[in-house]
Amino acid sequence: MTTIQFGLNVSTAATPGADPVADARMAEELGFDFVSANDHLHGTDPRFETWTMLSWIAANTSRIRVATRVLGVPYRNPAVTAKMAESFDRLSGGRLILGMGGGASDDEFRAFGLEARSPRDKVDGMEEAVRIARGLWSERSFTFGGRLSRTESAQIEPKPSHHIPIWLGTYGDRALAATGRVADGWIPSFDYAPPERIPAMRDRILGAARDAGREPDEITCVYNVVVRVDERAVPEPGVVSGPPAAVADRIAGFLQLGFAAFNFILAGPDRDEQTARLAREVIPAVRAAA
């Protein structure tokens, strides 16, 4: 039986009654492999900053892995992000999955006085951020001269005690090729990358990996999917919904596209019930089909 990983999105909403730690603990108790959170800072809706919230989650859980899904690279200096990641991973007992992306929300960057990068710069900046992290994590003194980011005899200690996986959320041809060159994982979203687009996108990644001298099997493909387990669910674009068996069949079908992990975002307000139904009625059926 193939080992499939299942993750659960933890909302960054900071509205009254929100309890991301309780949500993560429930996911851990129900056997999820990882929890994740997105990275949006700007706006009138109350929300937590991602690193801070996930650090609090890591401190209050013991087994479950913790993923950034995905950090907007322009928000933070890549070398500082690399050090933050090393510290987070060490303090959490080796549980970090570092997800990164080029940064889609130009209005957020402008609002915070950051440059809204061109599509080319977003891809290049993302790839440079990965190379900087890997260099700082492995070399005693690391100098890097990129188009957008640089380090000069930079040193961080201690080095990570193990390989920290880096997943990239990418869609365009150049970004997919960069994923193949440098990433450990690819995490597209169902609504932006529907199933019919996946084969060509994945081929682009695997081809770039081969061209870079990498083993394509080293790259974990993770599908980010909005789900609702509900016998009365009305079909919605971008949402996998229906009775447990129907949801499980749909998710299991994505295995044929090369996905080895899934990150679930819950649709609807009944979060605890949905989390439990996924864990007890959907995930076992998908595992059995793998």
Which residues are covered by each model-predicted region?
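Active-site-adjacent structural elements that line small-molecule/cofactor binding pockets in enzymes
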Residues: M1-A290
